[in-house]
Design a protein with these regions (language model features):
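Nucleotide/pyrophosphate-binding catalytic subdomain
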Residues: 1-5
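A structural signal for small-residue-enriched, beta-sheet-centric alpha/beta enzyme cores
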Residues: 20-122
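Phosphate-interacting basic helix/loop segments used at nucleotide- and nucleic-acid interfaces
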Residues: 6-23
Length: 122
């Protein structure tokens, strides 16, 4: 197995692999404040084994029109959902998400970081 991930994500992935024989997708998250929005959400700060970004540009929408801008931050959305399920202060550091048809990838969460030329807050 080729590991291209941060040390905490690598440790979680290797531990799961050694205990179960399966390599699950792993997302490590943290709280994140958002400009122009009240409240915080959890976002992915590391990931392994899962495609962090799902680019749907060029795909047809429900009306058959070609999508022009839809790029979904999958790892961030799953991180936020897991935080809601686990409870922010419940001291539940691990949440298992089932039922999402994820795509495997070894690219990591770096795909979520905005390119400097598109960053509104350099």
């Amino acid at each position: 197995m080729r590991l291209m991930m941060s040390p905490p994500v690598a440790i979680l992935t290797i531990d799961a692999l050694s205990r179960t024989g399966a390599a699950p997708a792993v997302i490590v998250s943290d709280s994140f404040g958002r400009p122009w929005r009240n409240g915080i959400v959890n976002v992915a700060i590391g990931s392994a084994g899962i495609e962090a970004i799902l680019d749907l540009r060029g795909e047809p929408d429900v009306a058959g029109r070609q999508m022009q801008a839809t790029v979904i931050a999958v790892a961030d959305e799953l991180a936020s959902a897991a935080d809601l399920a686990g409870g922010k202060v419940a001291q539940r550091p691990v949440v298992i998400v089932r039922g999402y048809a994820w795509r495997a990838s070894d690219a990591g969460a770096s795909a979520l970081v905005m390119e400097p030329e598109r960053d509104l807050f350099p």
